[in-house]
Amino acid sequence: MRLRAKWVLPVSAPPIANGVVEITGDTITAVGKLPGRCHDLGDVVLLPGLINAHCHFDYTRLPVPYRDSFADWIGDIVAAKAQQTPADYLAGIAAGMMLALLAGTTTVVNIECFPELITQLPSSPLRVIWCPELIDLIRPQELPAEPAGLAPHAPYTVSEELYRRCAQSGRFITTHVAESVEEDEMFRQGRGHLYEALRTRGRDMSDCGRVGPVELLHSYGVLGRNCLAVHANCLTAGDVRLLAETGTSVVHCPKTHRYFRRAPAPLPALLAAGVNLCLGTDSLASNDTLDMFAEMRELARVFPDWLPARIVEMATTNAAKALNQSTQLGRLAASAAADLIAVPVDGHTDPYTAVVFAEKPIAFMMMNGCQI
C-alpha cells in the first residue's frame, strides 16, 4: 500500500511535499517522493501516530476538584478510588483508551493501579505500555509476570528498597518526582502539608530534610536511560544537571500543570541541558481531555517562542526515545511500525504548525498497517 499526502512529516527527517509512505504488512518500507499508483489522502499532513508518555486510564471517571493543596487532592483521589468497583474501572479504562484513539494517539504509557484487570479489557488497537503502579503496600505476586514497565509511584510513597528493586530489574521505569512544592518541602526541608499528612499516617520520615527528591532517586540508582521522570516541576540547577548527565527523560503534562495552577515548568532549563522532553495528558482527574493535540496547543501557548517542530518531536520521536523504541515508533521511516495519522492542513503553510494547532478530527489513522 502507498499513501500520498500534501505533506509527509517523518519528524525524524525534513517534511516532504506531496510525499508518499509505502507500507507492507505492519511495517513502513519506504518514505519519499515515490513513483507509481497511490491512495491520495488529499490536503493533509501525514505523520507518525502520537505517543502519550504519561496517562492514568484508571482515573477516566474520577474528575476530582483541586482544593489548593496537593496533599488534600491526593487524599481525595484515594477516597474516590475506594468507591469504584472493578467493573467501574474496566469501563473507565476502556473509555479512556477510546478517547486516546479518537484523538490520534497510537501509543500510551499507562500507569495501572490494577494490573490484574488488564486481561479482562476488550481488545483495542491502541498500543499500551502497561506499567503497574507500585507502592510499598502492593505485594509482588499481584504484578503481571512480564510487565512492559514499572511505575513506582513517587518518592513519598515508595521506599528505597522498592525503588532499588525496580532499578535492578532492568525494566523501563516511570515515576512521579518533584511534582509539587509540597513534595519539595517534604524532602528538602522536612516540613510542609505533605510531610505532616504522611507523618501522621505512620510513614518513616527519615529520608526527609536532607536532599531533594531527584537527588534521592539518583542515590537509589533509579535515574538513567531506562527512566522516564514524570512532571519534574520543582528543580534546582543541580537536579537539571543530574537528569541530563544520567540520560533520564522527562514528561511534561501541560494542561494538568495549568489545572494545579503551578509556576512555569523548568522546561527551558531542561532543554538547554539536553534532557529528552516528552508530552503526556496525565488523567481526567486533572484534565478535561486525553487529547495530545490539546497538550501541544497548551505548550505552544505557554512557550510561544518554541518552534512547532520541537513540540511535535516531544509527542513523537522524543517519546519513542524515552521508551527505547526509536527505530519502531514516533517516526515515518523504513522498518518503523506502520502507525500513521493524518490531520487537515487547514490553510497552514508549515506542516508542523498545522499539526500543533490541529483542532479538526483526525482525517486518517492506521495502526500496525491496519486502517482504524
Q: Language-model segments: what does each one mean?
A:
Residues 1-36, 325, 370:
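N-terminal metal-binding scaffold of metallo-dependent hydrolase/deaminase domains
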Residues 9, 337-372:
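C-terminal cap of metal-dependent C-N hydrolases
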Residues 22, 45, 61-124, 143:
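Alpha-helical scaffold segments that flank or form the walls of functional sites
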Residues 33-47:
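Active-site metal-binding motif and surrounding structural segment of the metallo-beta-lactamase
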Residues 49-60, 172-182:
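Histidine-centered catalytic micro-motifs
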Residues 60-91, 180-224, 299:
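Active-site gating loops and adjacent loop-to-helix segments of metal-dependent hydrolytic enzymes
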Residues 181-195, 240, 244, 261-270, ...:
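Histidine/acidic-residue-rich catalytic or RNA/ligand-binding cores of hydrolases
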Residues 220-222, 265-345:
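His/Asp/Glu-enriched, well-ordered alpha-helical/loop segment
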